[in-house]
Amino acid sequence: MTNKIIQQLEAEQMTKEIPPFAPGDTVIVQVKVKEGDRQRLQAFEGVVIGKRNRGLNSAFTVRKISNGVGVERTFQSYSPMVDSISVKRRGDVRKAKLYYLRALSGKAARIKEKLV
């Protein structure tokens, strides 16, 4: 009984169209940032190292190298703070979680491009 009500409420809130992407893909996430009284979009571009598919609670982690320092950010897929997600490049990987990239740097951290 309660489960159906929760599923219905979650389905109503999951209206945002999210492009299909997988770990290894390079994505650009446009995030809404509020500075004082104005709001702007900030782009966060990096490699998806993990994805969690849980309906409304879905999330994904993006890793990028900024000024020689690795930066990871986890985004809730259906968050109102995430404006848009665009896939820049498809990566060819054999694992679902790419946490091993944290220990790699430079050319060793490159991911082959998927040829479709």
Swiss-Prot record:
GO cellular-component terms in the record?
Answer: cytosolic large ribosomal subunit
Q: Which domain of life is it from?
A: Bacteria
Q: What biological process terms from GO does the record include?
A: translation
Q: Which UniProt keywords apply?
A: Ribonucleoprotein, Ribosomal protein
Task: List, alphabetically, the InterPro entries matched.
Answer: Ribosomal_bL19 (IPR001857), Ribosomal_bL19_CS (IPR018257), Ribosomal_bL19_sf (IPR038657), Translation_prot_SH3-like_sf (IPR008991)
Key word Ribosomal protein present:
yes
Listed GO MF terms: structural constituent of ribosome
Q: Which Pfam families match?
A: Ribosomal_L19
List, alphabetically, the HAMAP family matched.
Ribosomal_bL19 (MF_00402)
What function is annotated for this protein?
A: This protein is located at the 30S-50S ribosomal subunit interface and may play a role in the structure and function of the aminoacyl-tRNA binding site.
The family annotation for this protein states: Belongs to the bacterial ribosomal protein bL19 family.
Q: What is this protein called in UniProt? A: Large ribosomal subunit protein bL19
What species is this protein from? Stutzerimonas stutzeri (strain A1501) (Pseudomonas stutzeri)
